[in-house]
Amino acid sequence: MLKPSTPAPDFTATLDDGSTFRLADCRGRKNVVLYFYPKDFTPGCTAEACSFRDNYGAIAAYDAIIIGVSGDPADRHAAFRETHALPFPLIADPDGKLRELYDARGWIPWMPPRVTYVIDKEGIIRAAMRHDFRVTAHVPEVLEALARFAPRTGPDAPAATVSG
């Protein structure tokens, strides 16, 4: 896993809707929550994605966007997003290059881990977490990390409703 206080590796990837995402485009504009998960439509991954969905407003209040990454193809991601009303995009990483770039490796080679990075507007990793089995543990830690460095925006910025 990459360590906090280090620069987040830049990348360009295709989102599930076919558009292109460039981490560099977020510099100076948005904080980024980049989370890696094993597979769409599995119980744990669905719970994790829905936890991010249920706290989307609270995370966005810190001027942050959420991006999910797994090895599933874009069409499966699109179906997963639609089925669970996910308000954030997903990146298809079938060859594992992005997972490798972010050192999100599992203890079991065929089982990708759950790793989440909180990246600030300057492209620096501010927090890194891994919880393979506590699937909803990432969101509270993401919110704590964002609260340490990013001011909440707007007078009615929503509070967290941690699910799970």
What are these regions (language model features)?
Residues 1-164:
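Chalcogenol-based redox active-site neighborhoods
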